[in-house]
């Protein structure tokens, strides 16, 4: 299996021409548009124009939905329902773009347990999944470094309750307390996931909201082996700087060439 190789636009901010030129020059298959700081416009004409520009920059893409102020599992049902409604717009955008998938967060920024409602989370995730299916879009949820998706047991419980597929974030898994405290490895975390892994965010580790690049193939090889074994064929190199992106791409290229 040769994975589809994409990168997140972070190093280039919103410079679409630079993003397009870099994608072509470096032979990437696609781009993940991370929209937390890049919201969709309400006016239909302006939204259509913005999506056309993203499509021109890369016909192959995935979307990372906003998360900073949206929580479908919030204990405040009004907030959770509103977040679910807003995220439907990003499912619509993914449908219009023909995106590979749209990825969401749950339990962002490791809220206190009493800030979340599992009932609201499961109900709203089911609503979003049904809507995504209606629109012909694959919806994924991502493991985070903190919160309910940061430990295999609680994450797997949510996945079993909902059947939602996963974007497996390698750096979040390596940076979470479960791995850092030696209770298991990144590969152990990955293998505990009971639903399909449709995509992966590839980098070494997240610390203080920064994504760090691997230095050698050995840093990532066991995890990449496990992703391939799991059938995950959409890899997003999610780095914040061009230097880190280039370093990670070199490691991934070396890994793929050795197979």
Labelled PLM ranges:
Residues 73-166, 218-221:
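Active-site acidic/histidine proton-transfer and metal-coordination neighborhood
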Residues 223, 227, 235:
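H/E-rich (His + Asp/Glu) clusters that bind or coordinate divalent metals
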Residues 3-9, 31-33, 61-65, 102-104, ...:
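Hydrophobic faces of well-ordered beta-strands that scaffold small-molecule active sites
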